[in-house]
């Protein structure tokens, strides 16, 4: 299951970085997508911090594109650290926005983060289309076909541990 989560978060990082790269010179579109993008990335950062029991860097939900790029890459590295150092069945305790204390497994938190990305990425893609732009393809299966084609073409071995 850890290999699966590593692959899923590699996909999210790749797609997030590709989306940001494709929009970096479109200031009009960035005004529409930065709130959703930064919210998703900060939420990921906060969940990582909850699991790792560390402090977060940003208190607000609106960060620049450059900060989104850096934070997304750091989030990916921290998620890999979580997967390497924690058991998926471990329980983490956290307080929600209404100050209610909950406990969830690392597995459930990571699955939630993944779904959260997918939800807001759909909104981001809809905004891009609404602006008359064809967005990059963000489907997981498309990514898998692309990465597998790349690996086959360049004879790259997949490391699964």
Language-model segments: residues:
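Helix-adjacent hinge/juxtasegments
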Residues: 56-96
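Short, contiguous alpha-helical
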Residues: 6-59, 100-161
């Amino acid at each position: 299951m850890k290999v699966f989560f590593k692959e899923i978060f590699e996909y999210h990082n790749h797609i997030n970085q590709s989306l940001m790269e494709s929009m970096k010179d479109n200031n009009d579109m960035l005004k529409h997508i930065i709130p959703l993008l930064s919210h998703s990335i900060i939420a990921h950062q906060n969940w990582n911090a909850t699991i790792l029991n560390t402090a977060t860097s940003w208190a607000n939900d609106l960060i620049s594109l450059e900060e989104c790029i850096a934070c997304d890459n750091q989030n990916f590295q921290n998620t890999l650290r979580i997967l390497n150092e924690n058991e998926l069945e471990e329980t983490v305790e956290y307080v929600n926005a209404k100050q209610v204390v909950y406990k969830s497994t690392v597995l459930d938190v990571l699955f939630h983060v993944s779904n959260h990305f997918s939800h807001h990425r759909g909104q981001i893609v809809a905004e891009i289309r609404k602006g008359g732009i064809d967005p990059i393809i963000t489907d997981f299966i498309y990514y898998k076909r692309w990465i597998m084609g790349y690996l086959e073409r360049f004879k790259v071995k997949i490391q699964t541990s």
